[in-house]
Amino acid sequence: MARSKTSQRWLKEHFDDPYVKMAQKDGYRSRASYKLLEIQEKDRILRPGMTVVDLGAAPGGWSQVTSRVIGDKGRLIASDILEMDSIPDVTFIQGDFTDDAVFARILEAIGENPVDLVISDMAPNMSGVRAADQPRAMYLCELALDLAGRVLRPGGDFLIKIFQGEGFDTYHRQVRDSFDKVQMRKPLSSRDRSREQYLLARGFRGV
């Protein structure tokens, strides 16, 4: 079957993308690594020895960046519905984050030790119908915030991909109620046409 013009356009954009080329050169699994690297350069959210949870981790771009910074004294628990090739010293849990059993497995892997940082690059499979996609995206954001509220230590941080649209303002207020400082980030490596932004919440106030 011949490729559609849309898919041909996407392929051209993908292979012409400088961040895709950089990822191949630098040994990262995806261009998404540079989004976290940009945020790290500006905000220094990752430090050696931290305990971090990475949601929506596959194919592993953010986990690669995180594991390199936190080092062998840090701890990283990653999860995704998709398979992810192993990364040294990373605990990976495969499953649907919206499934209570998978959520429980993540909590079990974290254990009793409080977490310093929760990061999430999760997004639903986009249909292109904004009225359907936005609620699914916000639902994932709600679940990630719920997890963060359960596992973060007081003073911990939370970084999540979020899309502008219905439910954004309410969610932003929810996060503000639990953290000292909330900022929005749009990395240069995030495509201009994408509605995605990253919400960075710092200073978890505790339950």
Curated annotation (Swiss-Prot):
Active-site residues (renumbered): 161 (proton acceptor)
Pfam families according to UniProt: FtsJ
Keyword hit for Transferase: yes
Catalytic activity: uridine(2552) in 23S rRNA + S-adenosyl-L-methionine = 2'-O-methyluridine(2552) in 23S rRNA + S-adenosyl-L-homocysteine + H(+)
Enzyme Commission number(s) from the entry: 2.1.1.166
Keyword vocabulary terms for this entry: Cytoplasm, Methyltransferase, rRNA processing, S-adenosyl-L-methionine, Transferase
InterPro entries (alphabetical): RNA_methyltr_RlmE, RNA_MeTrfase_FtsJ_dom, rRNA-MeTfrase_E, SAM-dependent_MTases_sf
The protein's enzyme class: transferase
Localization annotation: Cytoplasm
A Gene Ontology term for the protein's cellular component: cytoplasm
Repeat is among the record's keywords: no
Top-level taxonomic group: Bacteria
GO molecular function: rRNA (uridine-2'-O-)-methyltransferase activity
Binding, S-adenosyl-L-methionine: 60, 62, 80, 96, 121
Residue stretches spanning the membrane: none
Major place of residence: cytoplasm
Task of the protein: Specifically methylates the uridine in position 2552 of 23S rRNA at the 2'-O position of the ribose in the fully assembled 50S ribosomal subunit.
Family note: Belongs to the class I-like SAM-binding methyltransferase superfamily. RNA methyltransferase RlmE family.
Listed name of the protein: Ribosomal RNA large subunit methyltransferase E
Natural source organism: Ectopseudomonas mendocina (strain ymp) (Pseudomonas mendocina)
Record lineage: Bacteria, Pseudomonadati, Pseudomonadota, Gammaproteobacteria, Pseudomonadales
